[in-house]
Regions:
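Single conserved hydrophobic/aromatic residue that forms the stacking wall/gate
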Residues: 1-12, 293
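Intrinsically disordered, low-complexity non-transmembrane regions of multi-pass membrane transporters
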Residues: 8, 13-26, 217-252
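Lipid-exposed faces of alpha-helical membrane segments in multi-pass integral membrane proteins
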Residues: 40-48, 114, 118, 202, ...
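Short, hydrophobic transmembrane alpha-helix segments
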Residues: 27, 55-56, 272-277
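Alpha-helical transmembrane segments and their helix-start/interface "positive-inside/aromatic belt" motifs
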Residues: 24-38, 144-157
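Membrane-embedded alpha-helical segments and adjacent helix-loop junctions characteristic
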Residues: 20, 40, 55-144
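Transmembrane helical segments that form the transport core of multi-pass membrane transport proteins
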Residues: 248-292
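Membrane-core helix-loop-helix motifs of multi-pass transport proteins
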Residues: 137-226
């Protein structure tokens, strides 16, 4: 039975390699940076406005310039999602936790499964958090287990697939926030109808099962792996220097952070006790308060 299982796994792995290698070459050759998509889509919309709606070129440019900053608040919210997620992932508490989790990876297969699952969980919590946690965890595992580094990094970023069904999904949280740009058309839609809806949770659970298994099946054959020198992934030691002046001691003191953090915790408890729902502002505020205690 064991030989049959091993043989079927190798067969699946070979088929996945046959499918994935042409796709990898296609993406490497033809997939540009996201900025290029922004420019192309902007030009396509401008052309459509002139061809379909009959607007002149200068009228289209005028509308584009006038509306350029209308999404400034939304852009700031997205920036805070990324910044707070990055800061949380970079805290010593999270880094120590990732190092301990990396000790559980006793084999290359386990390493791929583990980094995929951790990346999925972190991305579901916050997509900015997941982007950084996945990369840091892949480095932590590569320092301890000899595993194909290409697949390890790909697995670390594959968890990003669940971000829009997670707690920091931009559209679900945006339409749950009063005053969003499309409130006049669709109203305010609470997260119990989007993020926490049964169909969305089913998809997320299915991805938590499928993505690690697919990544595990894509492991290259022996002799085809690409390894990285663990010494290149060593984390620099950051010295914790105590303040020598009153200003530096105040800056390094946790007391002020804990006091303002306590006010933030009190507000969050009051908000959710009053049947408050998740919104972009609440998620960002929650991460900011958590950062004050880490």
């Amino acid at each position: 039975i064991a030989s049959c299982l091993v043989g079927s796994e190798m067969c699946i792995r070979d088929r996945l390699n046959v499918i994935s290698r042409p796709l990898v070459r296609l993406v490497d050759r033809w997939l540009p940076d996201p900025y290029i998509f922004v420019v192309i889509l902007t030009l396509l919309v401008m052309i459509a406005a002139m061809a379909i709606e009959g607007h002149g070129p200068m009228a289209v440019v005028g509308m584009w310039g006038a509306g350029f900053w209308e999404l400034l608040s939304f852009a700031m919210q997205m920036l805070l999602v990324l910044v707070t997620g990055y800061m949380m992932a970079s805290t010593p508490l999270v880094r120590r936790g990732l190092e301990r989790l990396a000790d559980l990876a006793g084999s290359p297969g386990t390493a791929i499964l583990l980094v995929s699952f951790v990346s999925l969980a972190a991305s579901w919590i916050n997509w900015g958090f997941g982007l950084v946690v996945g990369a840091l965890f892949a480095k932590a595992i590569a320092r301890k287990v000899r595993v194909d580094y290409r697949l390890l990094v790909a697995s670390a970023y594959s968890g990003f697939i669940v971000w829009h069904g997670g707690l920091a999904g931009s559209v679900p949280l945006a339409i749950a926030t009063a005053g969003h740009p499309f409130e006049g058309a669709i109203g305010v839609i609470a997260t119990d109808r989007t993020i926490f809806a049964a169909y969305n949770l089913f998809i997320v659970i299915a991805l938590f099962i499928a993505v690690p298994l697919v990544n595990r099946m894509m492991m290259p054959r022996p002799g085809e792996e690409v390894f990285v020198d663990p010494k290149l992934l060593a984390e620099p030691e950051v010295a914790d220097t105590p303040g020598t002046t009153p200003a530096e001691r105040m800056e390094n003191s946790r007391v002020l952070s804990w006091l303002i953090g306590a006010a933030g915790v009190a507000w969050l408890v009051q908000y959710f006790a009053g049947s408050g729902t998740l919104t972009l502002n609440v998620v960002n505020f929650l991460f900011l308060i958590c950062l004050l205690y880490t």
